[in-house]
């Protein structure tokens, strides 16, 4: 049985992994100061993991569903090889005045295409086969986003889904009005039984599911 990581252990981990760098440090701080639910940003540990996964998978094209403040997009773009591109969609247009300057001011701005819009509708129109997809948008539509992603990711490609433990709420029976938790539960149950993929859940922060499309 896994125990929760203590604050001291978290501090130890952060002292023994790569630095997030000054730019991402300032972005994370600004996110928590200026945006509601700032803790939704990936942060140091998850950001370094995402970058490492990009190094391992070596994708040419990445799709991100849910940009928020841009922290995860920048982290993943840092791991892209020359010629690689990350397409990130944010459905909440109120975030654009905060997020766009941070993305465009980063050293990897030339590798990121930031769009305000619904990725479920817009991403398939790109006509691109993706090597990796990161789902981190509206939990109520996770299953729809997953089906969209599965249709445009290559065989052998990867789909990552954030927040799949949802602060432990998935362990309890969700109220009918709690559509966010219900969305995560339906997603988790569906993916667990989907013969088209292999999957594993990491108990990192709020839960990170790594899915590989068979073929």
PLM-predicted stretches and their roles:
Residues 1-132, 139-160, 164-215:
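A short alpha-helical cap/connector motif
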């Amino acid at each position: 049985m896994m125990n929760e990581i203590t604050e001291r252990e978290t501090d130890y981990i952060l002292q023994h992994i790569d630095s997030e760098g000054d730019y991402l440090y300032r972005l994370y701080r600004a996110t928590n100061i200026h945006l509601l639910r700032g803790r939704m940003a990936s942060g140091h540990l998850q950001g370094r993991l995402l970058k490492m996964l990009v190094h391992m998978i070596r994708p040419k094209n990445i799709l991100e569903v849910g940009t928020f403040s841009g922290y995860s997009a920048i982290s993943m773009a840092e791991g892209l090889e020359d010629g690689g591109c990350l397409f990130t969609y944010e459905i909440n247009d109120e975030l654009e005045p905060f997020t766009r300057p941070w993305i465009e001011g980063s050293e990897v701005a030339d590798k990121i295409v930031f769009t305000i819009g619904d990725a479920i509708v817009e991403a398939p129109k790109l006509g691109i086969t993706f090597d990796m997809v990161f789902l981190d948008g509206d939990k109520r539509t996770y299953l729809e986003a997953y089906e969209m992603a599965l249709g445009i990711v290559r065989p052998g490609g990867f789909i990552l889904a954030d927040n799949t433990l949802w602060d432990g709420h998935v362990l309890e029976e969700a109220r009918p009005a709690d559509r966010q938790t219900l969305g995560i539960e339906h997603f988790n149950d569906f993916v667990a039984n989907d013969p088209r993929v292999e999957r594993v859940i990491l108990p990192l922060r709020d839960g990170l599911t790594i899915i590989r499309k068979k073929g």
